């Protein structure tokens, strides 16, 4: 007679059971793409053991020193970002170096945004990302946990 194994039940979180933590990441000397993948995982909550795909169980992430990010190779001059106003001939293009000088937070935000899912949960996760160019941030009251990569 064949022995049957007990059926294991998958535990699914409800949105009331989710605890959102605050994490602090220092971007100084970090490579942009590698840092963005780790930030995206924490924002979606995939670093938690009880991650549930249909529930917003992500965390808050505070990134400091965004102006000291690193790009490999010749990407500072060869990587091009595009923006369009919606009017004919309204396309603008910027190199990574120009974008970094104009708005250093935007470089990390765009990299993380493009790694998140293009759904409602992805848009909610992006709102939990706080990026600052310097080493100061106004979220010390939340006591963020420092993540080292």
From Swiss-Prot:
GO terms for molecular function: mRNA binding; structural constituent of ribosome. InterPro entries: Ribosomal_uL13 (IPR005822), Ribosomal_uL13_bac-type (IPR005823), Ribosomal_uL13_CS (IPR023563), Ribosomal_uL13_sf (IPR036899). It comes from the Bacteria. GO terms for cellular component: cytosolic large ribosomal subunit. One of its GO terms (biological process) is translation. Keywords: Ribonucleoprotein, Ribosomal protein. HAMAP family: Ribosomal_uL13 (MF_01366). PANTHER family: LARGE RIBOSOMAL SUBUNIT PROTEIN UL13M (PTHR11545:SF2), RIBOSOMAL PROTEIN L13 (PTHR11545). Belongs to the universal ribosomal protein uL13 family. This protein is one of the early assembly proteins of the 50S ribosomal subunit, although it is not seen to bind rRNA by itself. It is important during the early stages of 50S assembly. This is Large ribosomal subunit protein uL13. It comes from Thermosipho africanus (strain TCF52B).
